[in-house]
């Protein structure tokens, strides 16, 4: 895109970079890139004595949703096992038929049975979840504490790479098998524990 007036012009823009004129003295440059990409943004002043104020926002897109299959839990207390089922791409019914007790989070048993390795549950944070997504894996996250605990699978992050917000993470909630913002997941208060499944 290009915007201009009689004094100066802001030009540029493609699928990863958007340059927007804010006023006669400022412009906003937004950059979005996958974690494997490197982007650099610069400002060039041609035939002018003054350079406008430029603010640059670095955004990152991490998407691991293709590694999991969404499923709805088949009992009120099988959210954790259903999250594990999503990460090994098996239905909860398949796990049950294979002798897995869905009422308990048998992480290592489920992982080993279907050719995966599991780590956790370990204490977690938004930064830790972000780093795991960046490493290439979805994250099973306990979103609260107490007797009514609930687990979801975090699959995606899209936002600023330095200021993390639960509003910028996307998860699959086994309560209804819907994709939603992490902060809107069932019983969400804050990330508490995390489990990661990796293909053996």
Q: Where in this protein do the model-derived segments appear?
A:
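A short beta-strand micro-motif common to beta-rich folds, especially ectodomain repeats
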Residues: 37-48
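Conserved active-site-adjacent core of cysteine acyl-enzyme catalytic domains
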Residues: 62, 83-200
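Short, hydrophobic beta-strand segments
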Residues: 29-35
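Short beta-strand segments that buttress and anchor functional surface loops
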Residues: 31, 45, 140-144
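Surface-exposed binding patches on compact interaction domains or structured appendages
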Residues: 1-28
